[in-house]
Amino acid sequence: MDLESDPRHLRACPADTAAGVLAWFVDLWRQAVLASGGCGGCPVAGVAMDADDEELTVAARAAFAAWTALLAEQLQATGVPADRAGPIAAVALTAMEGALVMCRVERSVEPLETVAVELARLLPDLT
């Protein structure tokens, strides 16, 4: 499936709250880290970091943009205002990418757990 045109292969988010969306997002990566014995990470980040080829860089940029847009849409669907959903999605993806590097180095999901707690604090009070 083409990440650039359809990032929904990540699966539909079952959450109906903003906190649930972020927890779901963290859990996707937690499962990947655990399944790899702490050695996994984001393949797109690996390509982006090592890409000397402009075409690969463009593809990685498109994948990250698609994931950010999907996460923002899911946050908006739970009531997060559009002007907050995009930035929160961007911070979430950026934090997750850094956490994945740390998980690999530490061979632990603890960096993901820290990110999960701190991401929840970014959410606006929707009550």
Annotated model-derived regions:
Residues 6-11, 33, 55, 75, ...:
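Short amphipathic alpha-helical interaction patches enriched in hydrophobic/aromatic residues
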Residues 40, 45, 83-102, 118-122:
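Hydrophobic alpha-helical segments that form the core
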Residues 19-22, 26, 41-45, 57, ...:
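A general structural signal for well-ordered alpha-helical segments in protein cores
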Residues 7-40, 89-92:
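Hydrophobic alpha-helical connector segments
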Residues 11-12, 30-34, 43-53, 74:
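Helix-loop "lid/cap" segments that line or gate small-molecule binding pockets
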Residues 1-3, 14, 18, 22-25, ...:
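Hydrophobic/aromatic residues within well-ordered alpha-helical segments
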Residues 53-54, 64-88, 125-127:
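Hydrophobic alpha-helical bundle segments that form small-molecule/ligand-binding pockets
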Residues 14, 18, 56, 81-85, ...:
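Residue-level recognition of alpha-helical structural elements
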